[in-house]
């Protein structure tokens, strides 16, 4: 019955007892079904009318709302209108078994039952936790009137009591399962006398009529019996709720076949009792949204209006209901103390977060401390040892076995006690267990045991050293990942500086750790412990950090590269090089192949960090506003977020259904926007990676997105192929403004520094400026006109304006289109400066430095350039990417800039350290002569001059000539020959540099040139399909003309013969003296890409774009064998010296080794693909060469690889800085190798002795 109805009945009880006659009234109530015949007899048995009336009213008080309404109607019907009027104000609005009132859907029946049972009311500030409440109710339904236990357990302050009360605040549950009522008993930590008092009070509550006994039970056993009888006879189908049970022995007093719901921190308390048991674990946190909701209710603000500190408070306490409520209550009194309470929480000052409340403890540390104090004395120290664990780290059992020097089973038993008492959490992973502490428990332990922490960390390290050697940890060990991630942390925290330096400066440790977890965490440790490592040796620390940062894109790939070989590429002064060389020599004794890069002194690495977060092209990357993070997106449809200093991955989000084209941080760094070819724009929470909004109003792919620069009112601008710009307000679900005006795709947009204007670039050849407030066009600048010549009709010229960037003062803007960067004054639209980057590349992207006059420009030929806009001079040339650079961006302070490329990497460069524009870069046209003690290289540089380089000494002689297209050295280094783009051929005599010119040149660019063995004759081929034989000493010429298309290449044979092959699919054998064809082989339907000649000159091989290779005899016009099976163009081939084997390489990165005699395939050498869709061998295999003993094969592709011919396995890989190697020159003894990559870097490699 409602409390209001009951009060009304009690208030007018005396008047009713005096006046009413019960017999007729009871007839009405029996007919209504609210009074039984037996109850009528009880009333009638009373002696007087007054006693009969008193007995009826007592019965009605024990009934529900229906009885009250029936009694009221009976009074009216029997003429007691005055008495009925007294009861009218107490009439319930609804009956007990139907309908709900307005208070959260709780019926008056529920409210009455809970009030009578002593169930606590909802807290003043309350948020629902529907999932957990439903889980508890499901377990209660399972009791179904039968005896049993439902246990709600969790750590201190997680809201167990509130959840228990909320679970029984349900009409159908009470009516269906617990019609006898609910009885709440607060237990807490009790001794026997305290428990007896609780039981006495409960028995008295349940037997208010004292029908079973006139006195209270004298001991626990008697109380247990009394309780059993009361529950069975007077309160069947009722629920007993025991709140905050600590000890198993307490429950034995209630183990008398009741239905019991209990809350506890120790889930093992029910182990001591009988009957069915159900368990509901309570997560320690509310979740971000629920936590914010509680704070907003306490301070009476909207969730979205809460300050940033509110989010940090929730994050810091992991949504602990107790902490959020304590802080909320304090903020209600002191609304300006957000920062103060956040600081106390961060500093673990729990004593200062104190507030009186309905909870038993005024501060979190009190609530947690009592749990620890209740542990057995013999395991308290073990719990103290957990003080050194880090937040959110799951620790395998084996780690604690090492720490405590105990067997696994013993450790699991100890830890299970902590888990049972909600002092520790456990994750089961297959057969093994991992344990972790809640953040607040970590904070509590850290604060409580602060004076012991250093010793505890030292104990951890010492125990590790007893069990393991750092680099011998095996990946199949349960605890190996923990030690790799946290051993350095324990050493640093233990003040064990010597041990930390020895660990971090060990190439063995670097190798073992990077192979398992990649380089980012190690870089983070070098940054974090730099102050300690620098004490030992600042230079060594820098050596290792630079090694990891610049090789990160390799160290994160599979198969894992040989770290010793990578270390050998470091400068000779580096500690990494010293250790690598030592290891290489030790392993070399066992036959392991290692290579020394002997000319590496001339190479400077300019990048500060190289990361490879994507598995496909990276289209865009950007810094966060604080410069600490980088977001990137690309063709793999993902958004990646990582630390700008170390490359540590923070978020990996499958963002869109198609390529992600652009991403941007909001000005407060709270959000990241992405836009995609799937036509959608998405907003993500930058901390959690949670999707916040999806906008899909563009009708074509969305190319760009950019947030306003100020955070007071966040707007996002997007541009699309649908020709429109759109402005989005993150507080709205739909587009705020659409801007019309462009007549072609919008490629790029940027807000001005003051957010007043929005600049947009389009394929229509214009830059437009828009007023952000009105969304009206303010100005249009026709960029296209700066690319028109007088004879070109404007409609025939397409100028795509790629991007734009504002100057820091907002008065100027740079625009990139084709191969020019233009600087405009936004007030006058006048052109202030023009930068021309050259004819051979297009500008992909540009960015203006925030603090000086530098602009960084990304070019299509893999290069990035820094220009001074004022002086219009190039300041730096940054090479390192292996493919198109799609995006560049300065950091907010301008000290560094990033570049994003098609090669799947992002590089971070320090602005001040990038090299000045003085480096001369080599082209891939080289010739090599190997001498006994020297390797001489003739190379063409980017100025098209010639360089003669002594490999070992590094001495360079410059032979400047313009437009050199190919070159060669005579066998004895007496002469240099070269051809140019115009078809001319010249010879330079060394060392006097006298020049001889061919009187008859080629009509087109010379592509190949070669001296005969005696150096007297020079043979050349060109794009004009003619081979020229020039005896330059006599001036005689022979022209070999028969090929129908360009000659691909040629080789000299014995007896004045020459083998040539062509795009026309033929191979021809010539007599170079007479110029006649001796043999004409029609080899392939496609282009003949290469030929190789056996050492006995009886056979040759041909490879083709038709994916086949063939073996031929010079005596037969039909092939001996056709070699099929390659899935790409077969680009190269080589015979072994003994003529038994032939190796072929294709465009898929596969090398095949064949038996020459029968054409059978012996081995397929295909490196494991790094990522799905990535070419093996880093690209096309362009050259192969056997060792003299035919046991080893070297191949060139994206990098160099050495193979064991007998097994087909890779024996070494040398990763060049660049890629797309065209050829490898190998010394006769197979110990020196020379090549040039596409960055123009020369590699002279020698087998390490």
UniProtKB/Swiss-Prot annotation:
Gene Ontology CC terms, in alphabetical order: apoptosome; cytosol; nucleus
Annotated segments matching region Interpropeller linker: 910-921
Keyword Nucleotide-binding: yes
Example of a GO MF term: cysteine-type endopeptidase activator activity involved in apoptotic process
Alphabetized UniProt keyword annotations: Apoptosis, ATP-binding, Calcium, Cytoplasm, Nucleotide-binding, Repeat, WD repeat
Domain of life: Eukaryota
WD repeat boundaries on the chain: 613-652, 655-694, 697-738, 741-780, 796-837, 838-877, 880-910, 922-958, 959-998, 1001-1040, 1042-1080, 1083-1122, 1125-1164, 1176-1213, 1214-1249
UniProt record, GO biological process: brain development; cardiac muscle cell apoptotic process; cell differentiation; cellular response to transforming growth factor beta stimulus; forebrain development; intrinsic apoptotic signaling pathway; intrinsic apoptotic signaling pathway in response to endoplasmic reticulum stress; kidney development
Localization in the cell: Cytoplasm
Impact when changing residue 265 to S: No stimulation of CASP9 activity
Tissue: Highly expressed in lung and spleen, weakly in brain and kidney and not detectable in liver.
Residues in NB-ARC domain copies: 106-415
CARD domain span: 1-90
Binding locations of ATP: 154-161, 265
Miscellaneous information on this protein: Physiological concentrations of calcium ions negatively affect the assembly of apoptosome by inhibiting nucleotide exchange in the monomeric form.
Purpose of the protein: Oligomeric Apaf-1 mediates the cytochrome c-dependent autocatalytic activation of pro-caspase-9 (Apaf-3), leading to the activation of caspase-3 and apoptosis. This activation requires ATP.
Notes concerning its domains: The CARD domain mediates interaction with APIP.
SUBUNIT field: Monomer. Oligomerizes to a heptameric ring, known as the apoptosome, upon binding of cytochrome c and dATP. Oligomeric Apaf-1 and pro-caspase-9 bind to each other via their respective NH2-terminal CARD domains and consecutively mature caspase-9 is released from the complex. Interacts with UACA. It may also interact with Bcl-XL. Interacts with APIP. Interacts (via CARD and NACHT domains) with NAIP/BIRC1 (via NACHT domain). Interacts with CIAO2A.
Name of the protein: Apoptotic protease-activating factor 1
Organism: Mus musculus
Native organism taxonomy: Eukaryota, Metazoa, Chordata, Craniata, Vertebrata
Recorded name of the encoding gene: Apaf1
């Amino acid at each position: 019955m409602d409390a209001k109805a009951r009060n009304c009945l009690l208030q007018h009880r005396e008047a009713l007892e005096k006046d009413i006659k019960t017999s007729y009234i009871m007839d009405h109530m029996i007919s209504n079904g609210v009074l039984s015949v037996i109850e009528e007899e009880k009333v009638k048995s009373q002696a007087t009318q007054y006693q009969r009336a008193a007995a009826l009213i007592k019965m009605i008080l024990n009934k529900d709302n229906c009885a009250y309404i029936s009694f009221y109607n009976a009074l009216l019907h029997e003429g007691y209108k005055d008495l009925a009027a007294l009861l009218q104000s107490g009439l319930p609005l609804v009956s007990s078994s139907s309908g709900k009132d307005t208070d959260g859907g709780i019926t008056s029946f529920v409210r009455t039952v809970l009030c009578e049972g002593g169930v606590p009311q909802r807290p003043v500030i309350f948020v629902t936790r529907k999932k957990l409440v439903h889980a508890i109710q499901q377990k209660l339904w399972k009791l179904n009137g039968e005896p049993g236990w439902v246990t709600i357990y969790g750590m201190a302050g997680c809201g167990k009591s509130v959840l228990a009360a909320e679970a029984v605040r349900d009409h159908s549950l009470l009516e269906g399962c617990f019609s006898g009522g609910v009885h709440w008993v607060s237990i807490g930590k009790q001794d026997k006398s305290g428990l007896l008092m609780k039981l006495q009070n409960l028995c008295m509550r349940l037997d208010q009529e004292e029908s079973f006994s006139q006195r209270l039970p004298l001991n626990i056993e008697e109380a247990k019996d009394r309780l059993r009888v009361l529950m069975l006879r007077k309160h069947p189908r009722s629920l007993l709720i025991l709140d905050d049970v600590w000890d198993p022995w307490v429950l034995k007093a209630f183990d008398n076949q009741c239905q019991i719901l209990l809350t506890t921190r120790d889930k093992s308390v029910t182990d001591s009792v009988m009957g069915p048991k159900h368990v509901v674990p309570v997560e320690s946190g509310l979740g971000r949204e629920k936590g914010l909701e509680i704070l907003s209710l306490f301070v009476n603000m909207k969730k979205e209006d809460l300050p940033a500190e509110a989010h940090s408070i929730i994050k810091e306490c992991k949504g602990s209901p107790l902490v959020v409520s304590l802080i909320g209550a304090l903020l209600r009194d002191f609304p300006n103390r957000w920062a103060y309470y956040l600081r106390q929480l961060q500093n673990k000052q729990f004593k200062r977060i104190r507030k009186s409340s309905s909870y038993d403890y005024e501060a979190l540390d009190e609530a947690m401390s009592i749990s620890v104090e209740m542990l057995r004395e013999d395991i308290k120290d073990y719990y103290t040892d957990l003080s050194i664990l880090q937040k959110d780290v799951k620790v395998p059992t084996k780690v604690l076995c090492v720490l405590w020097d105990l067997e696994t089973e013993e450790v699991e038993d100890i830890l299970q006690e902590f888990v049972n008492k909600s002092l520790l959490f456990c994750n089961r992973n297959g057969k093994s267990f991992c344990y972790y502490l809640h953040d607040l428990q970590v904070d509590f332990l850290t604060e409580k045991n602060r004076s012991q922490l250093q010793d505890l960390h030292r104990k951890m390290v010492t125990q590790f050293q007893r069990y393991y050697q750092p680099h011998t940890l095996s990946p199949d060990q349960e605890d190996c990942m923990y030690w790799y991630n946290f051993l350095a942390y324990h050493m640093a925290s233990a003040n064990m500086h010597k041990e930390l330096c020895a660990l971090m400066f060990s190439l063995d440790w670097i190798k073992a750790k990077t192979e398992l977890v990649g380089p980012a965490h190690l870089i983070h440790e070098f940054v974090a412990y730099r102050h300690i490592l620098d004490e030992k040796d600042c230079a060594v620390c820098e050596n290792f950090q630079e090694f990891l940062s610049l090789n990160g894109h390799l160290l994160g790939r599979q198969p894992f590269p040989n770290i010793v070989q990578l270390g050998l590429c470091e400068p000779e002064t580096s500690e990494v090089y010293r250790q690598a060389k030592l290891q290489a020599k030790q392993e070399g004794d066992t036959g392991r192949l290692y290579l020394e890069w002997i000319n590496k002194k001339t190479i400077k690495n300019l990048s500060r960090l190289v990361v490879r977060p994507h598995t496909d092209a990276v289209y865009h990357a950007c810094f966060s506003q604080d410069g600490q993070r980088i977001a990137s997106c690309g063709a793999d449809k993902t958004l990646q977020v990582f630390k700008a200093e170390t490359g540590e991955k923070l978020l990996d989000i499958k963002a869109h259904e198609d390529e992600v084209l652009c991403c941007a941080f909001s000005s407060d760094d709270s959000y990241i926007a992405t836009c995609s070819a799937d036509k959608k724009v998405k907003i993500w929470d930058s901390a959690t990676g949670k999707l916040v909004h999806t906008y899909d109003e563009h009708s074509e792919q969305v190319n760009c997105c950019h947030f306003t620069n100020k955070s007071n009112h966040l707007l996002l601008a997007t541009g699309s192929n649908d020709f429109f710009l759109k402005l989005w307000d993150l507080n709205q679900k739909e587009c705020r403004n659409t801007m019309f005006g462009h007549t072609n795709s919008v490629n790029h947009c940027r807000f001005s520094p003051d957010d007043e204007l929005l600049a947009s670039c389009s394929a229509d050849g214009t830059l437009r400026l828009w007023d952000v407030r009105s969304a009206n066009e303010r100005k249009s600048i026709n960029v296209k006109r700066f690319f028109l010549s007088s004879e070109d009709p404007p409609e025939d010229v397409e100028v795509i304006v790629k991007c734009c960037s504002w100057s820091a003062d907002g008065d100027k803007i740079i625009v990139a289109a084709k191969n020019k960067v233009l600087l405009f004054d936004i007030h006058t639209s006048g052109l202030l400066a023009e930068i021309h980057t050259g004819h051979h590349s297009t500008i992909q992207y540009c960015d203006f430095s925030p603090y000086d006059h530098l602009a960084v420009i990304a070019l299509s030929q893999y290069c990035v350039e820094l220009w001074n806009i004022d002086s219009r001079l190039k300041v730096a040339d940054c090479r390192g990417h292996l493919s198109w650079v799609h995006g560049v961006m300065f950091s907010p302070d301008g000290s560094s800039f990033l570049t994003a490329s098609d090669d799947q990497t992002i590089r971070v460069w320090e602005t001040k350290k990038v090299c000045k524009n003085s480096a001369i870069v080599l082209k891939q046209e080289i010739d090599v002569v190997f001498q006994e003690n020297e390797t001489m290289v003739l190379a063409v540089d980017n100025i098209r001059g010639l360089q003669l380089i002594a490999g070992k000494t590094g001495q360079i002689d410059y032979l400047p000539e313009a437009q050199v297209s190919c070159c060669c050295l005579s066998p004895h280094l007496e002469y240099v020959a070269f051809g140019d783009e115009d078809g001319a051929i010249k010879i330079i005599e060394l060392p006097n540099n006298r020049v001889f010119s061919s009187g008859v040149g080629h009509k087109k660019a010379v592509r190949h040139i070669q001296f005969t063995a005696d150096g007297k004759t020079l043979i050349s081929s060109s794009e004009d399909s003619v081979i020229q034989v020039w005896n330059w000493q006599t001036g005689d010429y022979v022209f070999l003309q028969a090929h129908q298309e360009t000659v691909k290449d040629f080789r000299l044979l014995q007896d004045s013969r020459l083998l040539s092959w062509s795009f026309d699919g033929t191979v021809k054998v010539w007599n170079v003296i007479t110029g006649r064809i001796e043999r004409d082989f029609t080899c392939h339907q496609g282009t003949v890409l290469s030929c190789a000649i056996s050492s006995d000159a009886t056979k040759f091989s041909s490879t083709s774009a038709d994916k086949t290779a063939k073996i031929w005899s010079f005596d037969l016009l039909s092939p001996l064998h056709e070699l099929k099976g390659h899935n790409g163009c077969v680009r190269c081939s080589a015979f072994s010296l003994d003529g038994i084997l032939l190796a072929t390489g294709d465009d898929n990165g596969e090398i095949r080794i064949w038996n020459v005699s029968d054409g059978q395939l012996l081995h397929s050498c295909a490196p494991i693909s790094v990522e799905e869709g990535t070419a093996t061998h880093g690209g096309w295999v362009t050259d192969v060469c056997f060792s003299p003993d035919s046991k080893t094969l070297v191949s060139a592709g994206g990098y160099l690889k050495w193979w064991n011919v007998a097994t087909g396995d890779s024996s070494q890989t040398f990763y060049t800085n660049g890629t797309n190697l065209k050829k490898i020159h190998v010394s006769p003894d197979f110990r020196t190798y020379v090549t040039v990559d596409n960055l123009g870097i020369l590699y002279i490699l020698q087998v390490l002795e």
